[in-house]
Amino acid sequence: MKITTEVAGKVWKIEAQVGAKLAVDEVILILESMKMEIPVVAPGAGKLLELQVKEGDTVKEGDVVAVLE
């Protein structure tokens, strides 16, 4: 399952590590957009297979940032 961003911004902080088992709505990373912190959460439970961004990266709305099993 691909996880995408809902807003454009900068990856401020990564909260989850590859290989972690995530619960529904668990925070994967936090974006900074217009001086607001916006969490990107797991839409379902599963193992985090891949992170496609790192802290400091700029993302656009709809960019894939992570892959969940």
Q: Which residues are covered by each model-predicted region?
A:
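Short histidine-centered loop motifs in beta-beta connectors
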Residues: 7, 13-17, 21, 50-53
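Short, surface-exposed linear patches
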Residues: 1, 25-27, 45, 51-53, ...
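Short beta-strand-turn/beta-hairpin segments enriched in glycine/proline and small hydrophobics
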Residues: 1-10, 27-43
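A short, glycine- and basic residue-enriched loop/turn
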Residues: 8, 19, 37-40, 45, ...
